Every structure is written in structure tokens, then in C-alpha cells.
Amino acid sequence: MSGTMRPRDGYAKVLARLFEGGSAVGLSEARLIERFAESRDEAAFAALVDRHGPMVLGVCRRLLLDPDDADDAFQAVFLVLARKAGGLRRKERVANWLYGVARRVALEARKRPRATVADDAAVLDIDARRPSPLDPAAVASRREDDARLHEEVGRLPERYRVPVVVCYFEGRTHEEAAALLNWPIGTVKGRLARARDLLRARLERRGVTVPAAFLASALAAPELRAAVPSALASRAVAAGLAAGASPSAWMTAAALSTSVRALSEGAIQAMFYAQ
């Protein structure tokens, strides 16, 4: 089980119940989703938040430098999962699905009024624990570079995007990805290499020259796997349970802010029209 969160308020208990007598490795993505979809199992949903939360929060923070916006987007992503869990077709690829939702939600949140670039620079300073202020122009440039990179990752064919999400954004080894996806290790490595080539070529067409080594480093950046505060994880789990209580219960759940509701509803509508 991931060590990125230090649960409290019962969060640890539901995870302990799920993993009692065994390891999280033995519980497949598909089985966790099935358990939640079938019986709204709190422990199963908590495990999904624990397993994929660092990637989701990392993406939200890279695209939304305001931490409150990122937290809202994080909760909205898992609320969408709770509402759509029963209809997921390729449950073993939920990481790829969550990445797509996280990117969509974060980009929608960017359209709302947000902090100035100078404020964004201060946020980055705190996160990186840097003693000197950051150049606002550099912050704006990095923000746009991140947006371009994630836009192009989102445009990759699924067979190339999936290993990028699993290996780079979630930090799994080639062997772990191969076991998860039921692919030969050579296929994982080959598709990652092809994904990098496609990304580099597409970014260059947009006027962004990215050396191969730099691209690999950017994709595997540690901040793409952010430690999830236990309070935030608990709110996401509570929101997921509220979404499963009844078709309308999630709209009035105390655990949900107006922003989280709006972002999740917008994402679901966008997914409907994209079908």
C-alpha cells in the first residue's frame, strides 16, 4: 500500500479492513472498482484513492498552481469516478481513465478566476521550499509548457498513453506495468519509447524543442506524484460514498463544496457529449 498518506478519522481503518490478511498488490484495479460499484464498499474506494491519488493530485497541481483549486479538482475527479464506476469498460486501466478526467477537470478549473502569476510564484516557492522568489515570467512559461505536455499526452493513442500514465505519472516499474496491463515487458518498453518519440515530434511542431533526456525527466517529475494529505483523501472518500448513496444525495453532501460539485458535473457533461 502506498505510504503517501497518513490517514485519520477512520480512513486508516477502512484500508486496514480491505487489506486484512493480504497485500494491496493482490487486489486488482478491476476488483476494487467492482466492489465499489456493486456494494459501495468504502474500503475499496479508499484503496482507489490511496493508489491513484498521488498521480491525480500531481496532475492537478501541475496544471493548477493554486492549491485550493488543485484540491477541489482532486475531489471532483474521484467524485466522477464514484458516479461512473459501474460503467467503466476497461477497469484495469483506471489510471489512464483517471488521468484523462484529472486533465479535463483541471483545464476546466483554469477557466475560472484564479490567482495572479505573482501569487502563483509564491505558491511554487512554498511547495519547492526555495528561499528566493521565482520569476513570474518563468512561472507562466512553465505553466504553459506543462499544459502543452499534458495536452499532447492526452492526444496520444491509448496504447501509448496508458504506459506513460502507469510508468511515468504513477511511478510503476516496467515489470509492474507489464503485470497490470497483461503485456510483455518488451511491449511496455517499446510503447514508452514510441510515446516519447511522438510527444517530442508533436511538441516540436508547436515550436517547443525538447531533448529526449529532458522529455523523459519531465514526464517522470516527482511532483507528478504528490503526497495526498489525509484530510483531503478523507473528503474524497466521503464524497464518493455520498455519490453512491442515491442519485441526488451527492448534490447536498456536506463534504462537497460548490466548486467540487460544479467541476464534477461539468466533467460528466463533457464526457457525455464526447461519446
Task: Enumerate the predicted regions with their spans.
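Hydrophobic topogenic segments
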Residues: T4-G21, G26, P67, D72-A73, ...
